[in-house]
Each structure stands twice: as C-alpha cells, then as structure tokens.
C-alpha cells in the first residue's frame, strides 16, 4: 500500500508533517483495503479549476475524489488545504480532525461508497484509530 503525495508546498498549513500525513493515510488505506492512492494538496484556486473541469461545478469545494479502475492506482483525492483551514474554523473543529474527516470521505468514495448511512459508518470506522469517530 502506498500514498503518492503531491502538492507538498501546501502541507505547512496542516498540523502534521509529510511523514505523519502519509502514515495516517496508509493506516486508513489498510482499513479500507485499498492499495495505492494519489493525494493532491492544493489551493482554493486549483480545486476550483478541478471542480469546474471534472465535476462541471462552479466554485471552491473542500475535497474531490476520483476512483480509478486500475490495479496499480485505486484513485485520487484532491484536497484544498485552504478550505480545510477555513472550514475547520467555521465549523469549530480542530484542523487535524476536520482534515482527517475530509480524507476519510474521499477514501470512502474511492472504496465505492456513495453518500448515506453506510458511507457514514465506513468513515467513522476509518477515523476510529485516531479517536475522531
């Protein structure tokens, strides 16, 4: 299992270093029984571009995920670090907790879940090792 982390210039805004970030994601992937994912850490401007280009939605979002039908790559997650920082304040959640909840959401989509009770349960289980469920 592996995490391909891109967009390292944005990680300084998050409350963990690159190695901690990758270790957390690898633990989540292990639970989700996924092999390899790409994670792009981006700005609001960049995620707005991807949101328009791939989802045909105008504006900023916090996370996008793209499952792939590839034995070497389960999927990609695009995470707006700007949105994580802003929304964690807005929702009064610690930035670490909020970031991990968005990552669990993206991983759930890559694992094949759609919004609903089963996905919520899956995300809660992904977060249990971090005591965030």
Swiss-Prot record:
SUPFAM superfamilies: Metalloproteases ('zincins'), catalytic domain (SSF55486). Zn(2+) binds at residues 105, 109, 115. The keyword Zinc applies. It is found in: Cytoplasm. It holds the Pfam family YbeY. It is an enzyme of class 3 (hydrolase). This is Endoribonuclease YbeY. It comes from Lawsonia intracellularis (strain PHE/MN1-00).
């Amino acid at each position: 299992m592996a995490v391909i982390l891109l967009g390292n210039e944005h990680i300084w805004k998050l409350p963990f270093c690159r190695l901690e970030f990758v270790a957390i994601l690898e633990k989540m992937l292990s639970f989700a029984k996924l092999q390899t994912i790409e994670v792009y850490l981006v700005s609001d401007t960049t995620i707005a571009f991807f949101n328009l280009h791939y989802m045909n939605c105008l504006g900023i979002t916090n996370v996008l995920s793209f499952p792939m039908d590839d034995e070497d790559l389960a999927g990609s997650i695009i995470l707006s670090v700007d949105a994580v920082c802003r929304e964690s304040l807005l929702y009064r959640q610690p930035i670490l907790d909020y970031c991990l909840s968005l990552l669990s959401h993206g991983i759930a989509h890559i694992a094949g879940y759609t919004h609903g009770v089963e996905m919520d349960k899956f995300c809660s289980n992904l977060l249990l090792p971090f005591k965030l469920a």
